[in-house]
Amino acid sequence: MEPLLSVLLPAFNAAPTLPSCLRSLQRQTERCWRCVVVDDGSRDDTLRCLREVAARDDRFEVVSGPHRGLVEALNRGLRRCTGRYVARMDADDLMHGERLAAQLRLLEAEPRLAAVGCHVRIFPRADLSDGRRAYERWLNSIDSARRVREEAFVECPIAHPTLMVRRAVLEELGYRDQGWPEDYDLLLRLLAAGHDVGVVPRRLLCWRDSPNRLSRTSPAYALEQFTACRAAFLASGLLAPAETYVLWGYGETGRALRRALLLHGKRPAFIVELHLGRLGKLIHGAPVISPENLPSHRGLPIVVSVAGREPRRQIRAALGEMGFDELRDFVCAA
């Protein structure tokens, strides 16, 4: 009988961290799984390590081939997955012993969920920057499918190595290379297709922060590529019915998002600013208005492009008091 759960684990030159990663998988309280490990043409001892583990534990299936990159490795491995659910894992991370069991319980109990993530602890802690600590706090504040949707255009609200997805859904979408992060792309496609993504609100993954991590070295993870990804999905989603929208915020993030949305034929009809010196002026042809003027322009979708969590909280509250509904009338996008 095939296990209910497949674990999809790509590996490239991961020999230093792979043994501890695999041990954390073997120590799961949920014992019935099969792990498809894809060696993406490693030049170190990754393949030897995998074959040694697979020789002792037949729950591991090793797939090897020439180096083709992460997206191809993920799709190659996905084709070998047979479980009803597919859990992602990276070769330099560690699972809490109850991760698989807790996520499996939630997916089995909530048929409406297509996928679930969990909270994380970023490590090693010694050299963790203030920015990474803030990102960890933000990730771990997201505790429901509703919150995943609300935060989806701020940053990726689920750490991808924590994701467990119904295989039928993942096979339908697959992974793709659009020049921006493949994990963020998948999450936004899940949501755009109407799927709900839940969260087990427990720290069930130790997420390694290292200078060699793909998110630090790949051009696909550059800030402008995240912005391009957000713009593409905003243009085909909330902003699809019209060519114009209201942009709240014209700082660095707002300016970058406006430029990215122009590539999709979307331009701001108005720009909301609190800066008194800008009120009544034009920015690239768009009048600058105060928040109090927004009810006069009801019907135009609103994109709140403000970087700070507290300012976003205040703006959400203000829009709610004016009768605007988040996700229907406005979204926040950093």
Protein language model annotation of sequence segments:
Residues D39-R48, D90:
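A conserved acidic beta->alpha catalytic loop
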Residues E98-R133:
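Conserved donor NDP-sugar-binding/catalytic core segment of glycosyltransferases
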Residues F153, D183, L187, L205-A334:
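Hydrophobic, well-ordered beta-alpha structural blocks that scaffold small-molecule cofactor pockets
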Residues G65-C81, A102:
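Glycine-rich, basic loop-to-helix element that forms the pyrophosphate-binding segment
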Residues R23-C32:
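Short, acidic, metal-binding catalytic loop of nucleotide-sugar glycosyltransferases
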Residues M1-S24:
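N-proximal low-complexity "stem/linker" segments adjacent to membrane-targeting elements
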Residues V86:
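Short aromatic/hydrophobic "clamp" motif used to bind/position activated sugar donors
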Residues V7, R79, Y135, S141-S218:
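Conserved nucleotide-sugar donor-binding catalytic segment
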